[in-house]
Amino acid sequence: MALKFAPFASEIELPFYTALSQLKIDHDKLDDSARPVLGLYEPRATQSPDQSSRMRVLGNALSSNEVPSGHIRAEGKIKNVNTIEDFKNMDKQAMLQTSAKQGQIWDAINDGTIYSIPSLLSSFTILSFANLKKYTFTYWFAFPALHSEPAWRKVEQPPKFSAEETTALTEELGTWRYSHDNREHGFFLAKRVYPSSEHPQDPESESTSDLPFKWVIGSLREFESGFFNGVDAKNQYVSFVDPSTYHENPGWMLRNLLVLVRRRYKLDKVQILCYRDNHAKRHVPQSLILILESIYDPEYQSTAPDQIPKVTGWERNSLGKLTAKVTNLAQYMDPAQLADQAVDLNLKLMKWRIAPELNLDAIKNTKCLLLGAGTLGTYVSRLLMGWGVRKITFVDNASVSFSNPVRQPLFDFKDCIDGGAKKAYRASEALQEIYPGVDSTGHVMAVPMLGHPITDEAATKMNFELLQKLIEDHDAIFLLMDTRESRWLPTVMGKAAGKIVMNAALGFDTYVVMRHGVTPEDGGPAALGCYFCNDVVAPSDLLQSVKDQTLDQQCTVTRPGVAPEASSKLVELLASVLQHPLKGAAPAPKLSSNHQSGQLEFDRDPPNHPLGLVPHQIRGFLAAYKTMLISGPSYDCCSACSPKIVNAYKEDGWEFIKRALTEKDYITELSGLAEVQRKAEAAANDVEWDSDEEGMEDEEPELL
C-alpha cells in the first residue's frame, strides 16, 4: 500500500513579525541573506487531523534556541527580500533544491553530520517580504522533503502498544532526553531488550512494571555501531516524534528519515515508530507503528546514486493551492504603536545606505526646551518630532490670536475663540494629537527680561526658579522669542548649566541661526560666541523693548518663508551638533582650498560626520537666495556668556538676577562693556583730525 504523509502547516506568532521588522530596519537593512530561525512542533493527540502537524515560529525565533517543554525543534532559515518583485521573481524550485541540499538534509545525510543535528530532517525555509510602511508580511514556507526511489510501501501495520508499554517507553525516552542535545530529541532508535541467562536484568535498574522486557533508547548514530545487533527485527524501531494525528498517515519529516534509512542504514525494510505520546497522557497509547518496505530495483532508479532525489515541500493554502500567504499586522496593532514604529521608520532607513553611522538615539533621547511657542517654536517642534525627538517642552505667556494659525502650524481657528488659548498649552496638546508618543508639556510664564523693571518680585522670582529648573531638566534649549532682551537670561542659564543653546532670529527677508559656544569639559574658555558676543551694549528696555514701537515693529513682519527656512536649519544644526564627538563643544568648520577647483571650501569635521558640516552661525538672505556660514569667537566682555557674568550668576543666583533687572548699568559694568565704551570714547577724543580750518571763512563756497 502506498504511503501518504501529512504535510506541515505554518503557524507564526504575531510578535515574530515585529521582531523581523526590527531586525530588517536596525540590522539587516539591504542585506537579504538567509538567517537562522527556530521552528517548533509537538505531538497534539487531542487535535483534529487537519489541525495537527503545525510548525510554530515564536516571537523569539530569530534570537533564541530555547525549546519549551514538550516541543521538538526544527532548523529553519528565513530569507527576507527587499522588494515584492524580488519575492515574485525568486526561483522557488531552485530555492527549495538549495534548502534541501547545500549543508542541509541531503549533504548532512551523506557526510554523517545528520547524526549531530537530526533536527535537520524536519527543517524548513521561509521566503518573505516585509512591507514596513503598510505592516503587511508576504511569506511562503517550504518544508523540503526528499523522495525515496522506489517509494516505500506499507506492508504491515502492527497493533499499538499497550498502556503499560507506552508508559515505560515514555519514561525511558524522557530520561534519555535529559542527557542529549535538544536537536536529537525528535529522532531516535528504540528497542525491546529481554533479559536472558547470558544478560540477566540488573535488579537495581529493574522497572516497577510487569513488562517482560526493558526499553532502550539510542541516538540515530548508534545504528552504525550495532545498536540493534542481536535484537529481533520485530523489537527494533527507527523512531521520530510525529505531530500528525491522522490514523494511518505519518508526519512529513518521515520522508527525509526514510532517505537516511536507505542511504546510511542500507535497509529496504524497516519498522517505524511514529511517536505521538506525551508524558501527561502516557497511559493512553497514541503512537503509530508502520512496517515499510522499499525493494531496490536498479532499472527503476531515475537518478544517479549520488544525485539528490526529487524534492517537494512548498506549503499549500487552505484550498490546496501553491501560493504565498499575506498577514496584515496593522489590524492587530494598537494605533499608538503603529505611529511609534512609523515615526522611526524613515529615520532608520537613512542608515541603510546614505548615513549608516548616524546615531539616531542621540537625537531621539535629547530633551528639548522651546522658549517661545509662536512662529519659530511651532515650526521647530514639528521638525524635532520629524527627527524622532520624544521630549518637547514649551514656554510662552501669549495667547493664540486670529493672525497666528496661518503662520504657526500647531494652531487653528478654534484656538483663537474666546480670547485665544494659551500658546504653550495648546502647542503641547497639538503635538500629542499629531503623535501620541511625544512627551510634551507647556508652561505659561514670562521670562524675566533685562531692562524690564520688577513689578512683582514674588512672581518674577517664581518664574526665574521655574525657568532654572526647566533648563536643568533639558539637554537643548531653543531661544525662539520675539525680543532680544528676553533671550538674555536663558543664555546665561544655559551657559552656566553647560547646555546646548540654539538660537534663531528673523528679519523681513533675513535670518540668523546659531548655536552658542559650550564651555569645554576641561574648564577652558568657549571657542564660540553667543548671540550677544558681538554687542558693545547690554540688551535693555530702552533699546529693545516693544513698548514704544509702532505696530509694524511690534509684530514679526517677515516674508512667510523665512520662519520655516530658519527653523529647518536650526533643527538640522542641532542634529549635526549631536552627531559630533564633542557635541556642543564642536568647533566651527575651517576653510581650506580645494585642490581640484582651487576654491575655498569648508572642511567636514570629523571627515566621517554623517550629516556634514557643523557651522557656528548661518545667516540667510532670502532676497538674494543666499546663505553664509560665519563664526565668531566668544567675547570676554559679553553681557551674557563671559566668565564674569556666568560666575556671578553661579555664585549669587536670584540675587544676581534681581540686581541685573533693577540696576540699569549693573551688567554693563560687571561684564566690562562700560569700560570698553569709555576707552572707545577716550580713543575717539584723542584722534587728531587732519584739517586746515584757517582761512575757511574767507573762501567762497563751491557752487554745485
Swiss-Prot record:
SUPFAM superfamilies: Activating enzymes of the ubiquitin-like proteins (SSF69572). One of its GO terms (cellular component) is phagophore assembly site. Pfam families: ATG7_N, ThiF. The active site is at C555. Gene3D superfamilies: NAD(P)-binding Rossmann-like Domain, Ubiquitin-like modifier-activating enzyme ATG7 C-terminal domain, Ubiquitin-like modifier-activating enzyme ATG7 N-terminal domain. Its main location: cytoplasm. E1-like activating enzyme involved in the 2 ubiquitin-like systems required for cytoplasm to vacuole transport (Cvt) and autophagy. Activates ATG12 for its conjugation with ATG5 and ATG8 for its conjugation with phosphatidylethanolamine. Both systems are needed for the ATG8 association to Cvt vesicles and autophagosomes membranes. Autophagy is essential for maintenance of amino acid levels and protein synthesis under nitrogen starvation. Belongs to the ATG7 family. Homodimer. Interacts with ATG8 through a thioester bond between Cys-555 and the C-terminal Gly of ATG8 and with ATG12 through a thioester bond between Cys-555 and the C-terminal Gly of ATG12. Also interacts with ATG3. The C-terminal residues 660 to 699 are required for homodimerization, as well as the interactions with ATG3, ATG8 and ATG12; and the C-terminal 17 residues are required for the ATG8 lipidation. The GxGxxG motif is important for the function, possibly through binding with ATP. This is Ubiquitin-like modifier-activating enzyme atg7. It comes from Botryotinia fuckeliana (strain T4). The lineage of its organism: Eukaryota, Fungi, Dikarya, Ascomycota, Pezizomycotina.
